C-alpha cells in the first residue's frame, strides 16, 4: 500500500529535495497545513515576516543571492498584498516560489465573502507571476514542483 501524504507534506518534502533552507512568510489559517508540515519535518527554517509583501521581498533577496527563494503567504487579501513584490521578482527573473493557501473547497470561487476569500485569486496570481497553479492533491503538488519550469 502506498503512503498517503498531505499536500503540505508533499510540498515540504519536495522543497527539501531542492535544498531549500528557508521559507519567508506570514502564517494564516489557510496555509497552516504547509507551515505545519515544514515545522514538523524540521529541515527548513521558517522566517516570519510582518506582512506578505515583506515575505516575498525577503524570498526575492534570497533567490537573487542563494538560489531558490520561497515565500508563504496568507490567502485572499494576504496573497494580494504580495502582488507588488511578486511583480518585482518576476521582472528581475528571480528564482522564487510563492506558496499560498486557499479557502475550503465548499467555499472556493463561491464569491460569498467567506473568511480570506477573494474573487478569482488564481487570476491575479497568474498576472503577477510567471506561472500560478491551484493545487488540489499531493500528487499534483509533487508533479508541479518537480517540473523545474514551475519552480523558477
Spell out what each predicted region is.
Residues 1-152:
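N-terminal alpha/beta PP-like core and its mobile active-site loop of ThDP/TPP-dependent enzymes
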Amino acid at each position: 500500500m502506498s503512503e498517503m501524504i498531505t499536500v503540505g507534506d508533499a510540498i515540504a518534502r519536495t522543497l527539501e529535495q531542492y535544498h531549500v533552507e528557508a521559507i519567508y512568510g506570514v502564517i494564516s489559517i489557510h496555509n497552516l497545513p504547509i507551515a505545519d508540515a515544514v515545522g514538523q519535518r524540521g529541515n527548513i527554517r521558517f522566517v516570519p515576516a510582518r506582512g506578505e509583501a515583506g515575505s516575498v521581498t525577503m524570498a526575492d533577496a534570497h533567490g537573487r543571492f542563494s538560489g531558490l527563494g520561497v515565500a508563504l503567504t496568507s490567502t485572499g487579501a494576504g496573497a494580494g498584498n504580495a502582488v507588488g513584490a511578486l511583480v518585482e521578482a518576476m521582472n528581475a527573473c528571480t528564482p522564487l516560489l510563492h506558496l499560498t493557501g486557499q479557502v475550503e473547497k465548499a467555499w472556493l470561487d463561491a464569491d460569498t465573502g467567506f473568511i480570506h476569500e477573494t474573487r478569482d485569486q488564481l487570476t491575479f496570481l497568474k498576472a503577477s507571476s510567471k506561472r500560478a497553479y491551484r493545487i488540489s492533491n499531493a500528487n499534483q503538488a509533487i508533479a508541479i514542483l518537480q517540473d523545474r519550469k514551475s519552480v523558477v
